[in-house]
């Protein structure tokens, strides 16, 4: 399953080669592959490559969100060209209940392009994922650029509105069955069972 991020968050075409994301099933999870321009702006986070890094969204990242739009439970995955990552589990809009989960993530990077490959275990996904969106961010200060696979349509923009990747109403329908066949059933997640018992 392939996606291209061709628009800014507010529906203007991007001014560079679009970020590409590929999702493929593999043993016990999903492989997420990123192929993207490398801006090297802002500079690399100070965290160790291959490890979680808090507030990674302040750096150059590609993000993917997997949502159950009935429960508003969702998985957020952030991948950085410098090797850091951030995995968040959310229950309700912006309500993070688990963060900085471990992730197998490899990066290869040239001067102007980077590629990443992450393995997402099924246990990280909420049950019955029905919606998806993906984002990319780069640049510093007033040159910060926010891009979205499914952006806010221009007629719906409000004056003074800022980018917000947690506008779940703009996520589009998504089904793992497209990848895995109609008979496939998403494995139950022990992680999300813990979250349910805490409510």
Curated annotation (Swiss-Prot):
Q: Which domain of life is it from?
A: Eukaryota
**Family to which the UniProt record says this protein belongs:** Belongs to the UPF0462 family.
What this protein is called in its record is: UPF0462 protein C4orf33 homolog
Organism, as annotated: Rattus norvegicus
């Amino acid at each position: 399953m392939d996606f291209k991020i061709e628009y800014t968050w507010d529906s203007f075409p991007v001014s560079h080669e679009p970020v590409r994301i590929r999702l493929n099933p593999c043993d016990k999870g999903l492989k997420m592959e990123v192929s993207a321009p490398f801006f090297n702006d802002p500079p690399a986070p100070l965290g160790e490559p291959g490890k979680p890094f808090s507030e990674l969204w302040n750096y150059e990242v590609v993000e993917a969100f997997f949502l159950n739009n009935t429960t508003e439970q969702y998985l957020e995955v952030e991948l950085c060209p410098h090797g850091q990552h951030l995995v968040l589990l959310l229950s309700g809009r912006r309500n993070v209940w688990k963060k900085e989960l471990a992730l197998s993530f490899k990066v290869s990077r040239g001067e102007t392009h980077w590629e990443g490959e992450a393995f997402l275990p099924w246990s990280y996904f909420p049950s019955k994922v029905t919606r998806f969106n993906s984002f990319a961010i780069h640049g510093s200060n007033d040159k910060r650029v926010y891009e979205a696979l499914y952006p806010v349509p221009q007629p719906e923009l409000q004056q003074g509105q800022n980018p917000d990747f947690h506008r779940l109403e703009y996520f589009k329908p998504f089904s793992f069955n497209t990848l895995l066949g109609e008979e496939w059933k998403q494995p139950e997640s022990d992680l999300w069972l813990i979250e349910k018992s805490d409510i």
